[in-house]
Amino acid sequence: MCGPYVLTYYPKEVLFMQKIPANELLAGLTLAEPVSIHAVVTDSREVKPGCVFVCFPGERVDGHDFAAGAYQNGAAYIIANHPVEGVPADRTVIVPDSAKAMIRMASNYRMLFNPKMIGVTGSVGKTTTKEFCYAVLSAFGKTLKTEGNQNNDIGVPNTLFRLDNDTEYAVVEMGMDHAGEIERLTRCARPSAGIITMIGVSHLENLGTRENILKAKMEICTGLPDGAPLVLNVDNDLLPTADVPTRLKAVWFGIDAENADVRAVDVETGTNGTTFKIIDKEYGTFDAAIPTAGVHTVYDALAAYAAATRLGLDAARCAAALATYQTTGMRQHIVKKGGVTFIEDCYNASPDSMRAALSVLKALPNTRKIALLGDMLELGDASEDGHRHTGEWAADAGVDQLIAYGPRSAAMADAAKAHGVVTVHCKNAEEVLQYLRQFVRPGDAVLAKASHAMGLEQLLQDFYKELPQG
């Protein structure tokens, strides 16, 4: 058979190579000769011989600037938006849109395998829910998951490129900034089940209204097969208004709503974890325990349980497997340093997740409570109200001292002060460290939460170095 030959991705773990016509597998990315590729990378530091390097033009860094170096280091082909100096023309594949090309490659590669896959989206709780899904699915077989929160046009393909013949289950997190992005990702991943955790105000800046956010999250339906379960939070004020396609099976989870298909009752939460009972209309009642604090994490666990059981996995084993959940990064991570309890929740923030995190702090008995809360980004017109409400929630949580960090947090500080909370408003990291040194003492509990761009993770690490060890 003569060319054209398609640029196809085959990791080393794959034991077979399937010939598929170029127009079926990857229209537009054809080469003059057949080739097998062992990796697809977007970071020039990860280039190895036999890989494909995909150039992404970014705001701060343009991947095209690293293409020649990638080729010199052994990249078999370069996917670029234009010819690149230092890379032979016959080793360059020109595409108008790198993201679309990568999505196409990943989509068609994914079709070589048939794992049971859960797709997760929502305004808040995506990554925690994804990790609960991973804990449950891993009890049944080899499971692939999205690493960190790599949930965009680059992260989802990178996850799918890690599929191999031994993968039995997978969970893929899908994020978005604009309408249409979830549809693109779900059509690429083709999950067997979908989860929408909740609809909040994250990305309101780009989408305008919560109703538009709901529409964008519901795009996950377009990649689900007929009869697939779509798992939704019945306690969220907006999700029950969603127009779920009749070809899908809606599965509602919650705590407050008695009509939930999967409901948690008798919830008891503390710093050592949370226990509850799962009442499942289809499979019965089960005891469950999770190593996380806060009622909001029960919702994430319920979503994972509901999705896994509706994929046919044993309900009792699914409930038990929730206990094997492990935190990732600084997400609801409780640690003790220098006699101080720190609730690290620094990766991202929205009004909904702020309120949930403050509820964890509120539940801690017999301790002085300090909240280090920073700016919440991408809230658009809801920003001032969101920060103001957070200040009010801090007061309701019994916060003794609030350190508000960032320009948007001025409204938070003002609201907390008005409700009697001792409050300082910091404009930079050094001011924050100064007040942490001044306020924090052994026996205290400190909640740290803000949008990732505020840099609280590094700030905490710097502060930890100043605390007594052991």
For every predicted segment, state its role.
Residues 120, 329-331, 453-461:
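ATP-dependent carboxylate/acyl-activation modules
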Residues 80, 84-89, 195-342, 366-367, ...:
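Acidic, Mg2+-coordinating active-site environments of NTP-dependent enzymes
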Residues 58-61, 327-328, 346-421, 470:
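Active-site beta-alpha connecting loops in nucleotide-dependent enzymes
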Residues 93-97, 423-432:
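Short acidic-hydrophobic, aromatic-tinged amphipathic segments that line or gate anion-handling sites
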Residues 1-104, 364, 392, 397-407:
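N-terminal leader/targeting and accessory segments in enzymes
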Residues 51, 70, 105, 120, ...:
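Residue-level signal for inorganic ion chemistry
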Residues 5, 21, 101-234, 240-246, ...:
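Phosphate-binding loop of NTP-binding sites
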